[in-house]
Curated annotation (Swiss-Prot):
Name the record gives this protein: tRNA modification GTPase MnmE
CDD domains: trmE, TrmE_N
Name of encoding gene: mnmE
Superkingdom classification of source: Bacteria
Assembly information from the UniProt record: Homodimer. Heterotetramer of two MnmE and two MnmG subunits.
Residues binding GTP, per UniProt: 225-230, 244-250, 269-272
A Gene Ontology biological process term: tRNA wobble uridine modification
Binding site for (6S)-5-formyl-5,6,7,8-tetrahydrofolate: R23, E82, K121, K443
Main location: cytoplasm
Pfam family, one: MnmE_helical
Lineage, opening ranks: Bacteria, Pseudomonadati, Chlamydiota, Chlamydiia, Chlamydiales
Gene3D superfamilies: P-loop containing nucleotide triphosphate hydrolases, Probable tRNA modification gtpase trme, domain 1, tRNA modification GTPase MnmE domain 2
SUPFAM superfamilies in the cross-refs: P-loop containing nucleoside triphosphate hydrolases
Species this protein is from: Chlamydia abortus (strain DSM 27085 / S26/3) (Chlamydophila abortus)
C-alpha cells in the first residue's frame, strides 16, 4: 500500500438518501479539494465547516458542506476533508471523479482505518471493532464492538503485556548475572499468575460473547398440535412455519431471527414430543431434544384444552416458561410446579404482550453484571490468547522447576509477541491487508 499519497472515496452507502459524504485523506487533501471547491480551503481552520459549491471543468456539480480536519487531529492522523453533498448516485460520484482527476487515488477497502492504525490513532483491536460496529445487527453485538473500540479490550492486553515485560526483565537479570545469589522467584510467579488469570477471563468470555453477538436461542417445544408453529408465526409476524391440525407436521428444526427491543433472538420451532414409529418424525424429535439442550431458554407449549402432559426433566435444568396456548378455547388447568406459567393464544393474540415482556425481563436479568465487561467475539483474538496462555504456562512451569533462565525468557518473549499480534504492533503486512480488506470502501 502507498502510504504517502492522497486517497478519496465515497463514505456513505450507495442509493437514495438525504446526503452523501466524500472523504479525502492525505498530504494533498486540502490542496486537491481547493481545486474544485469555491472557497479558499488552505485558509480554513481545522475542525470548521464551510458551505460552498464544487465545480469541475467550469461546470458546477453540487452545493456542498465542507468539513476540514488538519493533521494530526483527524481520524487518519492526516489532513482530512469531507464533502457533504446531496444524496443519490450522481452528485457524490462526480465529486469523487473530480478529486481523482485532480490527483487523488481511489481508496482501497478499509484504507482510511488502516491509515489511522499505521499513524497510531487506533490499534488493531480498535480497527477491527469499527468493522464490527458497522456489521452489528443487534444491540449486544453493537455494545461489545463499542466496548472494544473504546479501548477496554486493549487495556486488558496492555495490562498483560506489562506483566510479561516485568517478568521478563526479572528473568533476564538472572541470565545476565548467573553468578549472583538466586533471588526469590515468587515475584515473577505472581506476575505470570495475574496475567494468566486475565487471559483465562477473556478466553472464558468467548462462548458467551458469540452467543450475545449471534443472538439468544429460545426453543419452542412441547407435544404435537400444541401450537408451537403458530406461536413462532405470531411472535415474528411472519408465516414462517407451516400450521395444520395434523400432529407431527413440524419434523425439522425451523429457526427465525426475531428482534425484541434491539435484542436479537434466534427463535427455534421444533418437532412435537411424542412416541412414534415413523423414522422421519423420530429424527425430528431427536433434533428437537438436541436443540433444547443447546438452547439458552425453552418455551414449553401446551394445549389449554387438553389435560396437562408430564413435563420433561430438562425444563428444570434450563430457564423455562410453560405456555398454555389456545387459551381462547379453554381455561388452562392448574399445574403444580415451580416453573412460571402463562396463558396465551396465538390465534387471538391474548397474552402475547405479557409473553414478550417476560422474555425481555429474563434477558435483562441475564445481562446483570455484564455491562462494561469485555467479551471476545473474534476467533482471531481467541486463538492468539490461547497461544499466549500456553507460552505463559510453560514459563511458569520453568520457574517452578528452576529451568535455565534463557528457556524461560524465550517463552516470555513469544508470549509478548502474541500481545503484539493482538494490538498490531507485531504483525506482518499480509495479515494486516487481509484484515482491512474486509472493510467497506470509505471506512
Amino acid at each position: 500500500m502507498i502510504k504517502n499519497d492522497t486517497i478519496a472515496a465515497i463514505a456513505t452507502p450507495p442509493g437514495e438518501g438525504s446526503i452523501a459524504i466524500v472523504r479525502i485523506s492525505g498530504p494533498e487533501a486540502i490542496q486537491i479539494t481547493d481545486k474544485i471547491f469555491s472557497g479558499s480551503v488552505p485558509s480554513f481552520s481545522s475542525h470548521t465547516a464551510h458551505l460552498g459549491t464544487v465545480s469541475y471543468n467550469g461546470q458546477q456539480i453540487d452545493q456542498t458542506l465542507l468539513l476540514i480536519m488538519r493533521a494530526p487531529r483527524s481520524f487518519t492522523g492526516e489532513d482530512v476533508v469531507e464533502l457533504q453533498c446531496h444524496g443519490g448516485y450522481f452528485s457524490c460520484s462526480q465529486i469523487l471523479a473530480a478529486l481523482i482527476a485532480e490527483g487523488a487515488r481511489p481508496a482501497l477497502p478499509g484504507e482510511f482505518s488502516q491509515r489511522a492504525f499505521l499513524n497510531g490513532k487506533i490499534d488493531l483491536i480498535q480497527a477491527e471493532a469499527i468493522q464490527n460496529i458497522i456489521a452489528a445487527d443487534n444491540l449486544d453485538a453493537f455494545h461489545i464492538a463499542q466496548n472494544h473500540f473504546q479501548g477496554h479490550f486493549s487495556k486488558k492486553v496492555q495490562q498483560i503485556s506489562s506483566l510479561i515485560i516485568e517478568s521478563l526483565a526479572f528473568i533476564e537479570v538472572l541470565a545476565d548475572f548467573p553468578e549472583e545469589e538466586q533471588p526469590d522467584m515468587q515475584e515473577p510467579m505472581n506476575r505470570l499468575h495475574e496475567a494468566i488469570l486475565i487471559i483465562d477471563d477473556l478466553i472464558a468470555s468467548f462462548d458467551q460473547g458469540q452467543r450475545l453477538a449471534q443472538g439468544t436461542s429460545i426453543v419452542l417445544a412441547g407435544h404435537p398440535n400444541a401450537g408451537k408453529s403458530s406461536l413462532l408465526n405470531a411472535l415474528t409476524n411472519k408465516n414462517r412455519a407451516i400450521v395444520t391440525d395434523i400432529p407431527g407436521t413440524t419434523r425439522d428444526i425451523l429457526e427465525e431471527n426475531w428482534m425484541l427491543q434491539g435484542k436479537r433472538i434466534r427463535l427455534i420451532d421444533s418437532a412435537g414430543q411424542r412416541e412414534t414409529h415413523n423414522p422421519i418424525e423420530q429424527e425430528g424429535i431427536e433434533r428437537a431434544i438436541a436443540a433444547m439442550e443447546a438452547s439458552e431458554a425453552i418455551l414449553w407449549v401446551m394445549d389449554a384444552s387438553q389435560p396437562p402432559p408430564p413435563l420433561p426433566e430438562i425444563l428444570m435444568r434450563k430457564p423455562s416458561l410453560l405456555l398454555w396456548n389456545k387459551s381462547d378455547l379453554a381455561t388452562p388447568p392448574h399445574l403444580e410446579t415451580t416453573l412460571p406459567q402463562l396463558a396465551v393464544s396465538a390465534k387471538t393474540g391474548a397474552g402475547m404482550i405479557e409473553l414478550k415482556q417476560f422474555i425481555q425481563q429474563w434477558m435483562q436479568k441475564q445481562q446483570l453484571g455484564k455491562n462494561g465487561k469485555v467479551f471476545l467475539i473474534s476467533s482471531r483474538h481467541h486463538t492468539i490468547l490461547q497461544h499466549m496462555r500456553t507460552y505463559l504456562l510453560s514459563a511458569q512451569e520453568g520457574l517452578q522447576s528452576q529451568s535455565p533462565p534463557e528457556f524461560i525468557a524465550l517463552e516470555l518473549r513469544q508470549a509478548l509477541q502474541t500481545t503484539g499480534n493482538l494490538s498490531g504492533s507485531e504483525i506482518n503486512e499480509t495479515i494486516l491487508g487481509e484484515i482491512f480488506s474486509r472493510f467497506c470502501i470509505g471506512k
